[in-house]
UniProtKB/Swiss-Prot annotation:
GO terms for molecular function: sodium channel inhibitor activity; toxin activity. This is Toxin TdNa1. It comes from Tityus discrepans (Venezuelan scorpion). Disulfide bonds join C31-C78, C35-C57, C43-C62, C47-C64. Has the structural arrangement of an alpha-helix connected to antiparallel beta-sheets by disulfide bonds (CS-alpha/beta). The keyword Signal applies. Coiled coil: none annotated. Keywords: Disulfide bond, Ion channel impairing toxin, Neurotoxin, Secreted, Signal, Toxin, Voltage-gated sodium channel impairing toxin. It comes from the Eukaryota. One of its GO terms (cellular component) is extracellular region. Residues 1-20 form the signal peptide. Inhibits the sodium (Nav) currents in an apparent irreversible manner. Produces small depolarization and induces repetitive firing in squid axons. Is specific for arthropods (crickets, triatomides, crabs and squids), but is non-toxic to mice. It is found in: Secreted.
Length: 80
């Protein structure tokens, strides 16, 4: 039983240390990367080049999964 608790605790610690987020990546102004329907392959390439696990076009902007914390993401200040 102690082994199971230790294992679960380690998994939780790894999740805290290797944190990532799902978000709209942003350019230098804080604005989203625009895309159109059917450009999911372009968004996937952009997201993986930023260190994310994958991405797709959630029109009108790219949505990325697993972005590292160091990547800038959309924060509503751009109003676009």
């Amino acid at each position: 039983m102690k082994g199971i608790i230790l294992f679960i605790s380690c998994l939780m610690l790894i999740d805290v240390v290797v944190e990532s987020r799902d978000a709209y990546p942003a350019d230098w102004r804080g604005c989203k990367f625009s895309c159109f329907w059917g450009s999911s392959s372009w968004c996937n390439e952009e997201c993986t080049s930023l260190g994310g696990s994958s991405g797709y076009c959630a029109w009108p902007a790219c949505w990325c999964y697993g972005l590292p914390d160091s990547v800038r993401y959309y924060n509503n200040k751009c109003h676009k």
